[in-house]
Amino acid sequence: MKHMMKGHLNIAWKRSEFALERKGTSPIGATGRDRLMRNFVLQMGFGEPALAVLPRQYAALTFQPRIVLVSVVAGILLQSQALFAALGALLVWSALFPRPNPFSALYNLTIGGRPGAFRLGPAPAPRRGAETMAGAFAFAIALLIVAGFNLAAHVLQAVFLAASLAAAIGGFCLGTFAYHLRHGNVKFALATLPWAKNEKSYEVKGEHHE
């Protein structure tokens, strides 16, 4: 009996050691920042990221939102319909033609061209859905400025600015979140919020990349 108890204790200890090892190497059990980055990658429509490349992949995927954020701030300060229209055209182009995406091309030619950097390929459907939504916001703001509906333009600009900030530095993309909700992936959408700790796997409808 004593030997059996000792054997069970050894097995339990080995299992706990294995669990700790997995926790140290898995994005799920890592820091809150790692969890935020992992959830953002999944929300974008990509598969489970490896912890070793997670920071580089996250940085690559936030390159476009940061350019959009700078453009939105400039457009608001200048109240320029031309700037918002140009931004909208670039975003819709990126959604319709994901391979020649100008944002990804710029990243791959600069940061992505460095040794060991993560390179961007064609965007999955959730990311393209977010680009479409952002492009629609930009075009709507441009039209409102032209039409002289300043209050409505300011409201949309505030929403666009908040969404751009969330995607660029907050680990949350309103467009991809809305995409998953529209396609009935409610549990998955909630599980990929920046603060979510859910380790379960969900069947996701629609196109996703590994």
Language-model features, listed with the residues they occupy:
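Extreme N-terminal basic, low-complexity initiation segments
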Residues: 1-5
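Membrane-interfacial helix-loop segments of redox and metal-homeostasis proteins
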Residues: 7-208
